[in-house]
A protein has these predicted regions:
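Short alpha-helix
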Residues: 56-72
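A short SAM/SAH-binding and catalytic strip from SAM-dependent methyltransferases
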Residues: 1-11
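Structural motif corresponding to alpha-helix initiation and N-cap regions
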Residues: 12, 61-62, 86, 125
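A short glycine-rich, Lys/Arg-flanked "PGG" loop and its adjoining helix->strand segment in the class I
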Residues: 12-27
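Conserved class I S-adenosyl-L-methionine
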Residues: 27-58
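Short, glycine/charged-enriched secondary-structure capping and boundary segments
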Residues: 13-16, 43-46, 91-93
C-alpha cells in the first residue's frame, strides 16, 4: 500500500483484512505519511493549516506498528525512504495546483490559493533543477 493508510476509516479492519487474505508468512509493504514527520513535508511551510490537518489525520510510526501487530503481523523492518515528489519547485507547484492531495483538499479555497501563491513565489527563486524531496516511512510486516 502506498500513501493511502491514513484514508481508511477503519485502519484496524484494513490490517485484519490484509491478514485474512495473506498466507502465513505473507508480506505487507506499507509506504505511509506519519505524524512523526508531518512538519517536514514540503508543502507545510506554504499552507499554514496543513500542519494541523496532518496532525489530525495521520498516525504515528508506533500506532501503525501496533495496528499491524495486533492484526497478526510481525514487524520485519521500518525505514525512512527518500521520495522525490517533484523534479523542481515549479513542477511541485503545478502538481499541487491540481488539488488532488487529500490533506490540501481540506483547505478552503482562500487558504489553498494563498498557499499556492506562496509556493509559486518560492519556486520563482529556487534553483530550476532542485528536486523536492520528502522522507516517507516504509514498513514491512509479515503474517504470523
Amino acid at each position: 500500500m502506498s500513501m493511502v493508510f491514513h484514508r481508511f476509516d477503519d485502519r484496524d479492519q484494513a490490517a485484519r483484512e490484509c491478514h485474512r487474505v495473506l498466507r502465513r508468512g505473507g508480506t505487507v509493504c506499507l509506504r505511509a505519511a506519519t505524524i512523526d514527520r508531518a512538519g517536514s513535508y514540503a508543502y507545510v511551510p506554504f499552507f499554514a493549516r496543513s500542519s494541523a490537518i496532518l496532525n489530525d489525520v495521520l498516525q504515528s510510526q508506533t500506532v501503525i506498528e501496533t495496528i499491524f501487530t495486533s492484526a497478526g503481523f510481525q514487524s520485519v523492518c521500518h525505514e525512512l525512504v527518500r521520495s522525490e515528489v517533484a523534479g523542481s519547485w515549479g513542477a511541485y507547484a503545478n502538481k499541487l495546483a491540481l488539488r488532488v492531495d487529500s490533506i490540501l483538499a481540506r483547505l478552503s479555497d482562500q487558504e489553498f490559493d494563498a498557499g499556492l501563491a506562496a509556493l509559486r513565489e518560492h519556486a520563482a527563486t529556487a534553483p530550476l533543477d532542485e528536486p523536492v524531496v520528502e522522507l516517507v516511512d516504509f514498513f514491512v510486516f509479515r503474517s504470523v
